[in-house]
């Protein structure tokens, strides 16, 4: 476990993120819960905690600096990625975690109770049925960027942003004709030799 903690500290340093030992312990406790539940409920295709450390934890932390304001909705959150990871980092920030699969929300309610994460609100619903105002609308491996925008555009205002975490295939062909400001950032994930991108969508003022 000390080796994993050292790896987390190194990743935090590379990402220029300040975190406490308590937060590091919370991230590890979360990954242990994810690994445990995954054996029964198939929460994620990644089975072992060492791989989860890089492909889930560090991948989620790599977008932390792009989170603005006080509230975020995590669309198709699955096992809580990136929402739970970011909620541990930003305890004053409210995260609404949305997924249509009941077992995943059941898991996240267990995470909330086990880790005393009072700033997450897991909801078993479809994103198109959700109402509310959020500073960030984020998704990770949820769908194409086009589909993400179509399902979530009712949240987008002049004052917030949508963030799509993607791999190599960006698939945002249909957005270019819309009155949107679209920015693409190349994301470096510590210990991961793979292309990662972040698409940030805002309304044109």
Swiss-Prot record:
One of its GO terms (molecular function) is rRNA (guanine-N7-)-methyltransferase activity. The keyword S-adenosyl-L-methionine applies. It is found in: Cytoplasm. It comes from the Bacteria. Its main location: cytoplasm. Its EC number is 2.1.1.170. S-adenosyl-L-methionine binds at residues 76, 81, 127-128, 140. InterPro entries: rRNA_ssu_MeTfrase_G (IPR003682), SAM-dependent_MTases_sf (IPR029063). Keywords: Cytoplasm, Methyltransferase, rRNA processing, S-adenosyl-L-methionine, Transferase. Pfam families: GidB (PF02527). It catalyses: guanosine(527) in 16S rRNA + S-adenosyl-L-methionine = N(7)-methylguanosine(527) in 16S rRNA + S-adenosyl-L-homocysteine. One of its GO terms (cellular component) is cytosol. Specifically methylates the N7 position of guanine in position 527 of 16S rRNA. HAMAP family: 16SrRNA_methyltr_G. Belongs to the methyltransferase superfamily. RNA methyltransferase RsmG family. This is Ribosomal RNA small subunit methyltransferase G. It comes from Francisella tularensis subsp. tularensis (strain SCHU S4 / Schu 4). The gene is rsmG.
């Amino acid at each position: 476990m000390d080796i994993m903690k050292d790896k987390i500290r190194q990743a935090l340093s590379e990402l220029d993120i300040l975190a406490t030992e308590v937060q590091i312990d919370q991230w590890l406790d979360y990954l242990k819960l994810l690994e445990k539940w995954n054996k029964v409920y198939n929460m994620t295709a990644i089975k072992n905690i060492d791989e989860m450390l890089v492909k889930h934890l560090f991948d989620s932390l790599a977008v932390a600096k792009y989170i603005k304001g006080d509230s975020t909705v995590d669309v198709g959150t699955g096992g809580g990625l990136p929402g739970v990871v970011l909620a541990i980092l930003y305890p004053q920030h409210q995260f609404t975690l949305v997924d249509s699969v009941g077992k995943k929300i059941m898991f996240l309610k267990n995470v909330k109770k086990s880790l005393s994460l009072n700033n997450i609100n897991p909801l078993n619903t479809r994103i198109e049925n959700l109402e509310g105002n959020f500073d960030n609308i984020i998704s990770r491996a949820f769908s194409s960027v086009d589909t993400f925008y179509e399902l979530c555009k009712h949240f987008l205002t002049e004052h917030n942003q949508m963030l799509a975490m993607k791999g190599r295939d960006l698939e945002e062909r249909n957005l270019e004709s819309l009155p949107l400001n679209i920015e693409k950032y190349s994301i470096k994930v510590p210990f991961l030799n793979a292309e990662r991108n972040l698409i940030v969508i805002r309304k044109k003022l």
